[in-house]
């Protein structure tokens, strides 16, 4: 089979850096999908992406489709002539060109023909055009007078098969083997001689590393080297590194400085300025303290690097001066003073202002603190003030610092440490895998804030539907549940939801409590799925309706102890025997009239379970409880072997059925074992 390497390059205006990898992956996927549809084989695929180009190299692409035998099944041979003639006509042949063939035990007419495989070079224009059109682009652009759309205007197109140019016209461009170098070096134009040498040619002639991962590794290495030269450690944020890599074709890393006076500003502000606005990497000294220095990546190697450094230092100096001004101005007014301004900030239509939300968080934080034993006064105070930083100049400029700046301002106002820290960390966890607040007051306010949003939005009928979750309530609920589980808080979730709904007064529909609870349970299901807990185990616990998520967790953990061992088999066997006896019974009770029991086995079982019930009634050591319940197996077996449950004595029969039901209730105090079968 003859093969050649196929190269596609789209030369664009600067592509959006945060979408570069997505665009590259989509183009590669679409291209290989089209080849697979056409049954064109290839040995491997390489993707390349820089700010100005998307490229794909398909190694060992089959040069022609394989010949195929096309067989089409027609009518029965016993069909009317009209049907047979019609089938032949639809195939474009005379009737005598049809063949007869058994399909199962019945004879049919078939049309068979040999289809010669098409040459790959004749298919590539359509393949590439389809691959480009199928790239998902949120905001496509149109340019020139062409009826063509793409994420950015495309200025050149390379399509090569081996060393030959593939003739094609796509997006108004004629394919060639000509590419371009760096924009800032007179944009040299040169040829790609052979598809397989694409990466090597760009590196040698234009110093452009088109492989995203290799370019990223080069940048990382240079950053580490520059930091070492500054006797520092660079903090390399992976998402920032990806973004910077998507901004440069020829990376040149350098460091710069700013005045140490700016270190008086909270370091989160400095880092945000460097990272979010300037795309800089910050450095720490040997003691782990933030330095008044930064690392940046230029898109060219300058003959006079000092010019680039001076320019960057001038820009960040201006940025930090603004931040210093915000910091000084914001400290002039306390968070409490700003509460009035919160009343002018809308939280959500029908749910009032941010001031209303702050008051609800204050009430709910006090309630939660009382339940779990946290400081009610500090929790309530932090809840009231936690949103006041939203009306500060600093948070107006750096929205990602909300909460963090509130903590600094609270401390500046003279609020105690517990209140200040709780305010600073109450947004945590912000995303999956994020750390939880470190203080109990922070945990309390975080729960209150998240639950207030969830109950409010559900209460006005705008909860998540299907795949749509515009207010990120699923993520919020998962964060809330993580706090309760990982902090081991014994909180009744139904009561907590009711308290939150009541805090909204008449604004929301309080009948939504059950919907919210079910929503939270589904998020809990997702949490355990992620942690590879069997859904049978989850459903077994869910069936007994524990209302505390942490209590739910303890039951899950207990059942997991017994999976895949003999004790689980014993559990299932006990449950099966009990269920078989009780499945058609009604009017059951767990109150046993032991005065009518006559057999030793039933008396022994009742006495043992009565003693055990007292031991486990208030115990949340469910693993121990289950072990003690499993230990009843021999007594239960003896009861079933020696006692006739369905006796003619109605009173005795009822007592025995109630005894069995009583035993079942003890097992249900942990979970419904029937779900494990």
Swiss-Prot record:
<dbReference type="InterPro" id="IPR015944">
    <property type="entry name" value="Gly-tRNA-synth_bsu"/>
</dbReference>
<dbReference type="GO" id="GO:0005829">
    <property type="term" value="C:cytosol"/>
</dbReference>
<dbReference type="GO" id="GO:0006426">
    <property type="term" value="P:glycyl-tRNA aminoacylation"/>
</dbReference>
<dbReference type="GO" id="GO:0006420">
    <property type="term" value="P:arginyl-tRNA aminoacylation"/>
</dbReference>
<dbReference type="GO" id="GO:0004814">
    <property type="term" value="F:arginine-tRNA ligase activity"/>
</dbReference>
<dbReference type="InterPro" id="IPR008909">
    <property type="entry name" value="DALR_anticod-bd"/>
</dbReference>
<keyword id="KW-0067">ATP-binding</keyword>
<dbReference type="GO" id="GO:0004820">
    <property type="term" value="F:glycine-tRNA ligase activity"/>
</dbReference>
<dbReference type="GO" id="GO:0005524">
    <property type="term" value="F:ATP binding"/>
</dbReference>
<comment type="similarity">
    <text>Belongs to the class-II aminoacyl-tRNA synthetase family.</text>
</comment>
<keyword id="KW-0963">Cytoplasm</keyword>
<protein>
    <recommendedName>
        <fullName>Glycine--tRNA ligase beta subunit</fullName>
        <ecNumber>6.1.1.14</ecNumber>
    </recommendedName>
</protein>
<dbReference type="InterPro" id="IPR006194">
    <property type="entry name" value="Gly-tRNA-synth_heterodimer"/>
</dbReference>
<keyword id="KW-0547">Nucleotide-binding</keyword>
<keyword id="KW-0436">Ligase</keyword>
<dbReference type="Pfam" id="PF05746">
    <property type="entry name" value="DALR_1"/>
</dbReference>
<keyword id="KW-0030">Aminoacyl-tRNA synthetase</keyword>
<keyword id="KW-0648">Protein biosynthesis</keyword>
<dbReference type="Pfam" id="PF02092">
    <property type="entry name" value="tRNA_synt_2f"/>
</dbReference>
<comment type="subunit">
    <text>Tetramer of two alpha and two beta subunits.</text>
</comment>
């Amino acid at each position: 089979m003859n093969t050649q390497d196929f190269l596609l390059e789209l030369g664009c205006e600067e592509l959006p850096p945060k979408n570069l990898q997505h665009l590259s992956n989509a183009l590669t996927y679409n291209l290989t999908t089209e080849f697979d549809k056409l049954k064109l084989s290839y040995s491997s695929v390489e993707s390349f992406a820089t700010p100005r180009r998307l490229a794909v190299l398909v190694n060992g692409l089959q040069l022609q489709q394989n010949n195929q035998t096309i067989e089409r099944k027609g009518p029965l041979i016993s069909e009317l002539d009209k049907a047979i003639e019609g089938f032949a006509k639809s195939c474009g042949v005379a009737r005598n060109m049809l063949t007869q063939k058994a399909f199962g035990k019945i004879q049919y007419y078939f049309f068979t023909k040999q289809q010669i495989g098409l040459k790959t070079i004749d298919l590539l224009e359509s393949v590439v055009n389809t691959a480009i059109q199928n790239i998902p682009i949120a905001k496509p652009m149109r340019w020139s007078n062409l009826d063509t759309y793409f994420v950015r205007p495309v200025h050149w197109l390379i399509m090569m098969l081996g060393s030959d140019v593939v003739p094609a016209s796509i997006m108004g461009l004629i394919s060639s083997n000509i590419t371009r170098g760096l924009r800032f070096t007179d944009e040299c134009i040169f040829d790609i001689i052979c598809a397989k040498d694409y990466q090597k040619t760009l590196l040698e002639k234009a110093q452009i590393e088109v492989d995203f991962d290799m370019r990223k590794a080069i940048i990382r290495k240079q950053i580490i080297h520059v930091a070492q030269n500054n006797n520092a450690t660079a903090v390399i944020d992976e998402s920032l590194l990806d973004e910077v890599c998507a901004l440069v074709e020829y990376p040149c890393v350098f460091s710069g400085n700013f005045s140490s006076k700016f270190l008086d500003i909270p370091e989160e502000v400095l880092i945000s300025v460097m990272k979010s606005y300037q795309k800089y990497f910050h450095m720490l000294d040997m003691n782990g303290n933030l330095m008044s220095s930064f690392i940046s990546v230029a898109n060219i190697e300058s003959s006079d690097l000092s010019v680039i450094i001076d320019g960057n230092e001038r820009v960040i100096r201006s940025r930090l001066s603004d931040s210093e001004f915000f910091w000084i101005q914001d400290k002039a007014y306390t968070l409490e003073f700003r509460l009035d301004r919160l009343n002018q900030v809308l939280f959500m239509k029908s749910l009032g202002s941010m001031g209303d939300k702050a008051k609800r968080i204050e009430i709910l934080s006090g309630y939660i603190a009382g339940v779990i034993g946290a400081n009610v006064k500090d929790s309530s105070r932090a809840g009231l003030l936690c949103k006041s930083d939203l009306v500060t100049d600093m948070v107006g400029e750096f929205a990602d610092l909300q909460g963090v700046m509130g903590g600094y301002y609270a401390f500046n106002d003279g609020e105690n440490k517990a209140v200040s820290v709780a305010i600073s960390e109450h947004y945590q966890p912000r995303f999956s895998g994020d750390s939880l607040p470190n203080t109990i007051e922070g945990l309390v306010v975080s729960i209150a804030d998240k639950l207030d949003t969830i109950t409010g939005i559900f209460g006005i009928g705008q909860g998540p539907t299907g795949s749509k979750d515009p207010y990120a309530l699923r993520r919020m609920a998962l964060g809330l549940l993580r706090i309760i589980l990982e902090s081991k808080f014994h909180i009744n979730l139904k009561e907590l939801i009711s308290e939150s709904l009541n805090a909204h007064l008449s604004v929301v529909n309080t009948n939504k409590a059950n919907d919210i609870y079910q929503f939270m349970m589904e998020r809990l299901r997702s949490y355990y799925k992620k942690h590879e807990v069997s859904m049978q185990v989850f459903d077994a616990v869910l069936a007994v309706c524990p209302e505390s998520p942490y209590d739910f967790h303890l039951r899950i953990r207990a059942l997991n102890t017994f999976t895949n061992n003999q004790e689980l088999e014993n559990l299932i066997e006990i449950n099966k025997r009990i269920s078989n006896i009780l499945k058609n019974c009604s009017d059951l009770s767990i109150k046993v009239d032991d005065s009518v029991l006559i057999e030793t086995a039933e008396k022994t079982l009742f006495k043992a379970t009565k003693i055990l019930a007292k031991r486990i009634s208030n115990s949340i050591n469910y693993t121990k409880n289950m072990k003690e319940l499993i230990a009843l197996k021999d007594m239960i077996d003896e009861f079933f072997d020696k006692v006739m449950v369905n006796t003619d004595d109605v009173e005795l029969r009822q007592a025995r059925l109630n005894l069995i039901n009583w035993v079942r209730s003890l097992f249900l105090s942990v979970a419904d074992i029937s779900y494990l079968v």
